[in-house]
A protein has these predicted regions:
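Positively charged n-region of N-terminal signal peptides that target proteins for export
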Residues: 1-7
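Amphipathic alpha-helical scaffolding segments comprising HEAT/armadillo-like alpha-solenoid repeats
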Residues: 23-30, 54-65, 86-98, 133
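Bacterial N-terminal signal peptides
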Residues: 7-16
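Residue-level detector of extended alpha-helical repeat arrays and alpha-solenoid scaffolds
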Residues: 41-44, 74
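Short coil turns that connect the paired helices of HEAT/ARM alpha-solenoid repeats
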Residues: 30, 37-38, 66-72, 95-111
Length: 136
């Protein structure tokens, strides 16, 4: 039964997704750049890229979402800040390290659930096991 639940979650995340940067703060899951059997960019990931592509103008959006966004938006924001400025991103990830909020993570066609703290701590480690910055 848990496998069916994961498949259903993956399908939901692939169809009901934000399409604009304004909706970024409510993203339902953390997606890597390639998801699903086709390895395509999801709308969730595209909303992250839409913000990140703003360059320096993305910082205030990421900073706001780091505090008030969904669990996935908080992680995307820390990752985005890291891509813009590794020092600020590291500080953001450290601020999330103790979070017990649950976040679905989609890599390829696999959906797993972790705490925000687990993902943040893993990204900070020298040898990440769950995700790496290259996935974003």
């Amino acid at each position: 039964m848990p496998k069916i639940k994961m498949i259903i979650l993956a399908l939901v995340f692939a169809t009901i997704l934000p399409v604009s940067a304004q909706e970024f703060s409510d993203v339902p899951a953390l997606h890597t750049f390639a998801v699903g059997y086709a390895g395509a960019e999801s709308k969730v990931y595209q909303s992250f890229r839409a913000v990140l592509d703003k360059g320096e103008a993305a910082r205030p959006i990421f900073r706001r979402c780091l505090k008030t966004g969904s669990p996935a938006a908080k992680l995307y924001s820390a990752i985005g800040l890291y891509k813009l400025d590794p020092q600020e991103g590291t500080k953001a990830l450290k601020s999330l390290a103790s979070s017990q909020e649950q976040v679905p993570v989609m890599q390829g066609c696999i959906v797993s659930t972790y705490t925000v703290g687990e993902v943040a701590t893993d990204l900070l480690s020298p040898n990440p096991q769950l995700l790496s910055f290259q996935a974003f």
